[in-house]
Amino acid sequence: MTDRIPALQAWYGGTFDPIHYGHLRAVEALAREVKLTQVTILPNNVPPHRPQPGASSLQRKAMVELAIAGHPLFRLDTRELQRATPSWTSETMVQLRLEAGPDAPLAFIIGQDSLLTLRTWHNYEALLACCHLLVCRRPGYPVEMKTDEDQRWLAPRLARHVDELHREPAGKIYLADTPLYPISATDIRARLASHQSCDDLLPPAVLAYIQRHALYRPA
């Protein structure tokens, strides 16, 4: 009798400034497609590739908690919020791999925009050695890599079937057929700053928190 392979575990990182329906609905669709039973949201404190968030780490943590309350798919991991140094995904996934052991299938969720620049990421090869990458489609971004060289690099790493993600511990890149959600945190912050409605873009509890704490208002 063989040991049962642990269930595929997935993490979803970002600034979540603020968390919105574009984040949540894309991951819900991905979970159905890839057969995930749980996704861990991993907010970062010091994003290495973008400006500092408009909301504090505690405020962003609170908004994530409000957004996922009562939703069994999601849980929260605050380890990156506790760092004062840049949140390198590869370092976090190395730590998670050590915690999970060598055989558990692990995955990190990214958008198509991130896949296009993946080979510029800090220690991206170590990242793929630790986990699979699950790629959600993003509006306005091509499905092909930027160069022929990058496309040749990608081809042998692509997972052709969901079962590969559950059988193997790491190393595959899965291009999910998730719906396109034309929602971005940048647009939401701009709408909030100009007092436009965001009722259909954010969970009500998150919007109420933003209004209560006067977040994303012009200086």
Curated annotation (Swiss-Prot):
Coiled coil: none annotated. Signal peptide: none annotated. Keywords: ATP-binding, NAD, Nucleotide-binding, Nucleotidyltransferase, Pyridine nucleotide biosynthesis, Transferase. Its EC number is 2.7.7.18. SUPFAM superfamilies: Nucleotidylyl transferase. GO terms for molecular function: ATP binding; nicotinate-nucleotide adenylyltransferase activity. CDD domains: NMNAT. It is an enzyme of class 2 (transferase). GO terms for biological process: NAD biosynthetic process. The keyword Acetylation does not apply. It catalyses: nicotinate beta-D-ribonucleotide + ATP + H(+) = deamido-NAD(+) + diphosphate. Pathway: Cofactor biosynthesis; NAD(+) biosynthesis; deamido-NAD(+) from nicotinate D-ribonucleotide: step 1/1. It comes from the Bacteria. Belongs to the NadD family. HAMAP family: NaMN_adenylyltr. Catalyzes the reversible adenylation of nicotinate mononucleotide (NaMN) to nicotinic acid adenine dinucleotide (NaAD). This is Probable nicotinate-nucleotide adenylyltransferase. It comes from Cronobacter sakazakii (strain ATCC BAA-894). The gene is nadD.
